[in-house]
A protein has these predicted regions:
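Hydrophobic membrane-insertion alpha-helices, especially the h-region
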Residues: 30-53
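Short, surface-exposed beta-strand-loop junctions and turns on beta-sheet-rich folds
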Residues: 93-95, 105, 128-129, 220, ...
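General beta-strand recognition
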Residues: 86, 97, 119-121, 157, ...
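Terminal targeting segments of Actinobacterial cell-envelope proteins
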Residues: 1-33
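Short linear S-[DN]-x-LW-Φ motif typified by the pepsin-like aspartic protease active-site region
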Residues: 3-4, 54-119, 136-140, 146, ...
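Short, surface-exposed interaction patches in beta-rich subdomains
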Residues: 183, 194-282
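Non-cytosolic head/periplasmic domains of membrane-anchored proteins
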Residues: 119-208
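A generic beta-sheet turn/junction motif
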Residues: 80-82, 91, 115-117, 151, ...
């Protein structure tokens, strides 16, 4: 009686786990990590939302109205983190009036006014969790007082000032009118609009925005630049000629004014991406 023939054992399936395959428990651990990470993110989102809601509920607004003897002030300096600033020159004013509107949320807005060595210094600073922080400032002053204004996030407006004017904003427009003497206007992200200028020297520049300058009297020197935007100058139609320099990487140039390379009146215009126009009133 012959022995039965035994078939060889079947070959391992290619789909079966090999000894080198990672244990199944690692998949569970990975899933746990994702669950924990998602839970943390959800908790953070809930905390952030709760803080925003608490900040909104805690929002408060207050106003101030203060006056200072103009004879004791030789300059005005304003610096605000968030908030529009307006300065208006008034003939015959013997007081400098400062009106402010201060808004705060979960944390207080640090707002202060003080006189230091003849300089009226106004500050509006935002702290942590200061989503609702804002310091709006309106000033009425004699026209001959020099002003320096810095705002991180909002517009600046100055009118009818004959002293030196220096304005800077990170994110906001600058609008001025009827200024004279030396003027500097600078914005990182915003337009610069100036009208009825009698400034002897003016520098205006923006990273992203339009520069538009309209003069009521011939300037001595103008430097106007925009990295991304058009630049336009409108000059009074008088016999004066100008030493003109224009430069744009991507844009057209229209320079329909009287020019003279030996003139002591200088205009420099440039734009990275934008048109340059210098003309007389139409």
């Amino acid at each position: 009686m012959s022995s039965p023939t035994l078939s060889p054992p079947p070959s391992p399936s290619p789909w079966m786990d090999s000894p080198s395959d990672p244990p199944v428990r690692r998949t569970s651990r990975t899933r746990s990590v994702w669950v924990i990470g998602g839970s943390i993110l959800t908790a953070l989102a809930l905390i952030f939302g709760a803080l925003q809601a608490a900040s909104a509920l805690a929002t408060d607004t207050r106003t101030t109205d203060q006056s200072f003897d103009a004879g004791e002030i030789n300059a005005i300096e304003i610096s605000v983190d968030n908030g529009a600033v307006v300065i208006d020159g008034r003939e015959g004013a013997d007081q400098i009036r400062v009106q402010s509107r201060i808004r705060e949320g979960l944390t207080s807005t640090d707002f202060s006014l003080r006189v230091t060595n003849g300089r009226l210094v106004i500050r509006g600073e935002c702290g942590w969790l200061s989503e609702w922080c804002e310091s709006r400032v309106n000033v009425i002053a004699p026209p001959n007082v020099p002003v320096v204004v810095t705002s991180d996030n909002d517009d600046i407006t100055v009118r009818r000032m004959r002293g030196g004017v220096d304005l800077t904003t990170e994110n906001g427009d600058i609008a001025v009118g009827r200024l004279s003497q030396r003027v500097r206007l600078q914005s990182e992200n915003g337009d610069i609009i100036a009208k009825q200028l009698a400034a002897s020297t003016l520098r205006a520049g923006t990273e992203n925005g339009t520069v538009s300058l309209v003069f009521s009297s011939p300037p001595g020197r103008v430097d106007a630049t925009s990295e991304n935007g058009d630049v336009e100058l409108v000059l009074p139609d008088t016999p004066e000629a100008y030493r003109l320099s224009t430069n744009t990487d991507n844009g057209a140039v229209d320079d329909s004014i009287r020019t003279d390379p030996s003139s002591n009146r200088t205009i420099n215009m440039s734009s990275g991406n934008g048109d340059l126009t210098v003309r007389y009133p139409s």
